[in-house]
A protein has these predicted regions:
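Acidic/polar helix N-cap motif
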Residues: 4-8, 134
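Conserved C-terminal "lid"/linker of ANL adenylate-forming enzymes
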Residues: 78, 89-91, 103-149
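AMP-binding/adenylate-forming catalytic core of the ANL superfamily
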Residues: 1, 9-115
């Protein structure tokens, strides 16, 4: 954390080679030529079991080819009831004539129990900020109750 010494000390660690390394918690890999690929942003455990990661969840859902979904992506939000645990929300852009109720059963059948979204929210289009999906904006919207029914 920028203004949190304890969080900074936990993230920046001195290794046995004498160099300081930043431990972000991100998950990825480096190829032999030194190219780094980030797959997901750290660990996000779900209360009751399972570790949430948007990319594998989105890939599984895309592979299921759920009829009625034009685009889908997950947002992972802190669980307000369980410290250090998270909840998945699924955002979808639906094909014309479909509703969230039309896709819900197939979505849930396509995902492991721990991956199943606490809510499926339809949007007219995927929101972007600086050419990336605006997950942070959606997290703020979820936390503010914008999508509460």
């Amino acid at each position: 954390g920028y203004d949190n010494k304890k969080a900074t000390d936990n993230a920046i660690k001195l290794h046995s080679d004498g160099k300081k390394w930043l431990h972000t918690g991100d998950i990825g890999y480096m190829t032999e030529d030194g190219t780094i690929y980030a797959l997901t942003r750290g660990e996000a455990p779900r209360y009751g079991g399972g570790s949430l990661a948007t990319l594998p969840m989105e890939n599984r859902l895309a592979d299921a080819e759920v009829e009625g979904i034009d685009d889908e992506f997950f947002v992972i939000v802190q669980d307000p009831e369980h410290h250090r645990c998270f909840l998945p929300y699924l955002f979808v852009v639906l094909e014309e004539g479909y509703t969230v109720d039309d896709i819900r059963e197939k979505v849930n059948e396509s995902l492991e129990d721990y991956m199943q979204p606490v809510d499926i929210i339809a949007l007219p289009e995927r929101p972007f900020f600086h050419f990336k999906t605006n997950r942070i904006g959606l997290i703020h919207d979820i936390e503010a109750g914008k999508f509460n029914k």
